[in-house]
């Protein structure tokens, strides 16, 4: 998202850089349907799911960006940034940034399947990042930025594989997104939660996240 270097991510260890993906958006009807549904615009980060909700765990680069995308969708009840897929228990952000923990930055989404389906969340996932770049999103490089879908059950696994096959027809390069079981999700530090919502005028938010959201918004208006 955005050309060139993005501003540094406050005083934390990992700089964020993104380039706007120069490819046409697809699945516009799905996105239009989502925006037409009534829903809340501000979400909490309480990830206690109920018997009416389900969880999806997705990694598509910087979790600030992915979180901001899903917080705005009707049917999404809560979004939490965190880490998954590695071997280090209770990792810190600084540890994950080294690339040595095996963890990816991920977003865990609590959603009401009667309002938005898992398949629709996946449709947005393919639009919100470039799944053809290995261990990289724009200028963010490292295994912690890998494209990954962590499934919670066999139904999610099947849906993810089917969605990936369909999405592959839309990209000129092979999709490198991993589809793996979720073993443990670690919630990220508090300052990561609702980052865009709470820091919309921060340099990274203005240079990277806002253009990404505007791009998705334009897709729903055509």
Annotate each PLM feature.
Residues 22, 36-222:
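Flexible coil/turn and secondary-structure edge motifs
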Residues 28, 34-37:
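Hydrophobic alpha-helical segments of integral membrane proteins
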Residues 22-29:
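Sec-dependent signal peptide recognition
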